[in-house]
UniProtKB/Swiss-Prot annotation:
Family annotation (Pfam families): TsaD (PF00814)
Cited HAMAP family: TsaD
An example molecular function term from Gene Ontology annotations: N(6)-L-threonylcarbamoyladenine synthase activity
CDD domains, per database record: ASKHA_NBD_TsaD_bac (cd24133)
Protein name: tRNA N6-adenosine threonylcarbamoyltransferase
Cofactor note: Binds 1 Fe(2+) ion per subunit.
Organism listed in the record: Aliivibrio fischeri (strain MJ11)
Length: 338
């Protein structure tokens, strides 16, 4: 079975073709970073219009890369949510239309389920069950995963997501958009210990997160110190250290609570080198294992959507011709694979 996956939930247009026997056959990705850079953030209307321009050409390019035609495709998977409603409608409408024209089934895919299953694209995928840390610009949550569709949310952010806090703090420091990766790069030249940031919500039981206070703390620290490069690097280090420590503490609690020794990390922030390093050290200490996708599959992409859709189409799931777009869609509402 070969599935064409389409991802248009925010500011990346992703298309991929996944074969259940041969694996990933083609992967195309277009980022809108330059389009939104002048605005300092994603402009929904511009994002939607650009998806309209890019999705069909990327589908053609993916088919060409795989050496396939439309007759070789057995199903369509498209991101239906959560995300920006206009952007979701572009991918959903194109996916549904192609499925109708090509006479193949189509399946709406949950964006965060795609991220959660992205490590399954690797040569050594994690086995079920495991604890998943989904950490991106729009979401930060801890999920107990017993199987595909068997998700229990253990904790989530009550305000800003971790990636959002990175980007907002980077903006306070005068870094370009998108600021998160630039802040992490700046932190590499920072001095450990000069500044001490709090570890929010780690002094109480539970697995929820809160990162908006760190942004405020960073703003006050920036205002109260010299505006030189080393000081900014030291602040960046302290901020990143606080976020990573907070995530690690919550992961350790979740693993202890569930009795598991496998941790999966996915989403855009999972590409952060310092976060990977710290979680690897933590898991080694407790005799566990940590899994994450290759860097190119940490951000939004069509490959994870094609893979997730493949699992559900093989399970016999499909939907009617109505276009589905769900800006809000809790992951624990998904049906389990039988």
């Amino acid at each position: 079975m070969r599935i064409l996956g389409i991802e248009t939930s925010c500011d990346e247009t992703g298309v991929a073709i996944y074969d259940d026997e041969k694996g990933l056959l083609a992967h195309q990705l277009y980022s809108q970073v330059k389009l939104h850079a002048d605005y300092g953030g994603v402009v929904p209307e511009l994002a939607s219009r650009d998806h309209v321009k890019k999705t069909i050409p990327l589908i053609k390019a993916a088919l060409n890369d795989a050496g396939l035609t439309k007759d070789d495709i057995d199903g369509i998977a498209y991101t239906a949510g959560p995300g920006l409603v206009g952007a979701l409608l572009v991918g959903s409408t194109i996916g549904r239309s192609i499925a109708y024209a090509w006479d193949v089934p189509a399946i709406p895919v949950h964006h965060m389920e795609g991220h959660l299953l992205a490590p399954m694209l690797e040569d050594e995928p994690p086995a079920f069950p495991f604890v998943a840390l989904l950490v991106s610009g729009g979401h930060t949550m801890m999920v107990e995963v017993k199987g595909i569709g068997e998700y229990q949310i253990l904790g989530e952010s009550v305000d800003d997501a971790a990636g959002e806090a990175f980007d907002k703090t980077a903006k306070l420091m005068g870094l370009d958009y998108p600021g998160g990766p630039l802040l992490s790069k700046l932190a590499e030249s920072g001095t450990k210990g000069r500044f001490k940031f709090p570890r929010p919500m780690t002094d109480r039981p539970g697995l929820d997160f809160s990162f908006s206070g760190l942004k405020t703390f960073a703003a006050n620290t920036i205002r109260g110190n010299e505006d030189d490069l080393q000081t900014r690097a030291d602040i960046a280090f302290a901020f990143q250290e606080a976020v990573v420590d907070t995530l690690a503490i919550k992961c350790r609690r979740a693993l202890k609570q569930t009795g598991m020794k496998r941790l999966v990390m996915a989403g855009g922030v999972s590409a952060n080198k310092y976060l990977r390093q710290e979680l690897e050290v933590m898991m080694k200490k407790i005799g566990g294992e940590v899994y994450y996708p290759r860097t190119e599959f940490c951000t939004d992409n069509g490959a994870m959507i094609a893979y997730a859709g493949m699992q559900r189409l093989k399970n016999g799931e499909t939907t009617d011709l109505a276009v589905q777009a769900k800006p809000r869609w809790p992951i624990d509402q998904l049906a389990p694979i039988k």
